[in-house]
From Swiss-Prot:
Organism encoding this protein: Eremothecium gossypii (strain ATCC 10895 / CBS 109.51 / FGSC 9923 / NRRL Y-1056) (Yeast)
Membrane topology field: Multi-pass membrane protein
Family of this protein: Belongs to the ATG22 family.
GO CC annotation: fungal-type vacuole membrane
Name of this chain's protein: Autophagy-related protein 22
CDD domains linked to this entry: MFS_Atg22_like
InterPro entries attached to this UniProt entry: Atg22, Atg22-like, ATG22/LtaA_families, MFS_trans_sf
Alphabetical keyword list: Amino-acid transport, Autophagy, Glycoprotein, Membrane, Transmembrane, Transmembrane helix, Transport, Vacuole
GO BP terms: amino acid transmembrane export from vacuole; autophagy
Glycosylated sites: 262, 496
Record function comment: Vacuolar effluxer which mediate the efflux of amino acids resulting from autophagic degradation. The release of autophagic amino acids allows the maintenance of protein synthesis and viability during nitrogen starvation.
Annotated transmembrane regions: 24-44, 90-110, 126-146, 150-170, 203-223, 234-254, 295-315, 329-349, 365-385, 393-413, 433-453, 462-482
Compartments (UniProt record): Vacuole membrane
Higher taxonomy: Eukaryota, Fungi, Dikarya, Ascomycota, Saccharomycotina
Length: 507
């Protein structure tokens, strides 16, 4: 018998209600504390800071004995005892590629531990531990001297890896929070789990974006102060401090309301088994995906377009700084514009495409990909024309709006399309594969853009690659048949259910 079916006294029930409410607010606070890191620091601040450190320690492209000056348009950074020279923009891109690679490995490994030790208390401790390390790594950038670019890259990788872990663990808390909330609300009304999950998840995302928006506004104010003029490290310090400060109440807010079935106590002696479980889970997910043709088509297409969309942001920020010479404050404003329009795109674009234009799901995805492809295509026009094609700073503000709408719309539509293709009862397995595809793809783009920039010393050439990548995803998604995928998913779900019934019959 499940513990959840045991009747409780009024006193115990009131205690459960109070604990459940704390868990809900704790989950919102997790998003509130951590979202500014990925939206502000990783998307804008760290690329600028890495390029700045690289330029300050760089040398001229043609003469490696002469230090890089303020008037030099392109410079290279000596690495590994001056054995290797990389473009100052490439340094940031290579750091991101390495960070995402290590983050993916760490996330897969940690997910095995979380799947075995399912208690809210354990997940809370993981959130606090990695959040504290990530926050400290972020804040530590303010202590660096101008020549410590290796340490800056290391701190960037550490903080990004920590965010990846708390993002996965935080998302795994959502089903627990919903389950507990449904348990205490069932006395008052019938609750639909999917609807409750959607509501809480949506509110959490909204709260996270509000936090990121507040941090961005505070950063603009700080960077405009005479004593902090364009010192991006102050903005990074704000993000790290925010992350650590607002996660502290989780110590008192997140805890178990009921005993979780099949949960085990964490033991250091079983660490190898925990790590192995994460990779086995990934293998099982890949095996399931291999049985569904349209899931494979979607994941291949998503690998391509997700990589392109993510890399467009990094390339555009670095391009704006190195080619258009935009100030840090202006680049933060561009980031704010992107974020606001991403929210608008996520809310209104799916409704416009499906209800007003009556487009089928996969065609909506293709329309959004074409919309996003305008950005790198417009960047390539700069090779042909003198007055358009990202030749002026004001063009970046227009493209920030365009990019935000495409990013928000793609995120919303892609998840809804993918949800139609997966079998019942396997949602967690397939969405973990979706998440890993999303994260893993972000290694390729920055790495290739870094190589292109090293070869040409002109980051504008990266727009050719990004445009080709966006275009390459269109025939892949055009081969997607959502109706066929739904039938395959239903058939696989039916097979799994019949196996369970057969096993029950022999029990």
């Amino acid at each position: 018998m499940s513990y959840e079916t045991i009747p409780t006294s009024d006193e115990n029930f009131d205690r459960d209600v109070s604990a459940t409410n704390r868990n809900v607010f704790g989950w919102y606070l997790y998003a509130f504390s951590s979202e500014p890191f990925i939206v502000s620091a990783m998307s804008t601040y760290f690329p600028l800071l890495l390029e700045e450190f690289a330029r300050n320690n760089g040398v001229q492209v043609d003469d490696h004995t002469v230090a890089c000056g303020a008037e030099d348009k392109h410079c290279v950074l000596p690495l590994f005892g001056r054995r290797v020279f990389v473009d100052t923009s490439s340094f940031a891109l290579y750091t991101f590629a390495l960070g995402v690679l290590l983050q993916t490995v760490l996330v897969i490994s940690v997910s095995g531990v979380v799947d075995v030790c399912k208690t809210v208390r354990f997940k809370r401790n993981v959130l606090l531990s990695f959040g504290m390390v990530g926050g400290l790594a972020t804040c530590s950038t303010v202590l660096l001297r101008g020549n410590q670019y290796y340490i800056l890259a290391l701190l960037t990788v550490i903080s990004n890896c920590c965010y990846g872990v708390i993002n996965v663990v935080g998302n795994s808390l959502l089903p627990d929070v919903v389950s507990d909330l449904k348990r205490v609300l069932y006395l008052y009304r019938v609750i639909d789990s999917d609807q409750l999950t959607t509501v809480i998840s949506g509110r959490g995302s909204g709260i996270g974006y509000i936090a990121a928006f507040v941090v961005q506004l505070c950063s603009v104010w700080l960077l405009r102060q005479p004593e902090y003029r364009d010192d991006i490290r102050v903005a990074v310090l704000l993000v790290g401090g925010w992350w650590m400060l607002f996660q502290l109440p989780l110590i008192w807010m997140l805890d178990d309301v009921v005993v979780r079935e099949n949960s085990t106590q964490f033991k250091w002696s079983r660490s190898r088994q925990y790590l192995k479980a994460g990779w086995q889970s990934l293998g099982h997910a890949a095996m399931h995906a291999n049985l569904l043709k349209d899931v494979l088509i979607f994941l291949v297409g998503w690998f391509i377009i997700s990589d392109s969309i993510t890399t467009i942001n990094s390339a555009a920020i670095l391009f704006s700084k190195t080619e258009l010479h935009m100030s840090t404050v202006n680049l933060v404003v561009i980031s704010i514009l992107t974020m606001i329009n991403a929210v608008i795109g996520a809310y209104f674009v799916p409704q416009l495409l499906s209800e007003r234009l009556e487009l089928p799901p996969h065609q909506s995805l293709i329309y959004l990909i074409c919309w996003a492809g305008v950005i790198p295509f417009y960047g390539t026009l700069g090779f042909v024309f003198q007055s358009i094609g990202l030749k002026h700073p004001f063009e970046m503000y227009i493209l920030a709006v365009w990019y935000g709408i495409s990013m928000g719309g793609l995120a919303a539509v892609s998840r809804s399309v993918f949800s139609l293709l997966i079998p019942r009862g396997k949602e967690s397995t397939f969405f973990s594969l979706f998440s890993i595809t999303d994260k893993g793809s972000s290694v390729v783009g920055p790495l290739l853009i870094g190589l292109i920039t090293d070869k040409t010393h002109n980051i504008r050439y990266s727009f050719y690659f990004l445009f080709l990548f966006v275009v390459a995803s269109i025939p892949v998604f055009n081969a997607l048949n959502v109706q066929r995928g739904k039938v395959e998913a239903e058939e696989l779900a039916g097979i799994n259910e019949s196996r369970l019934e057969t096993n029950d019959g022999f029990a």
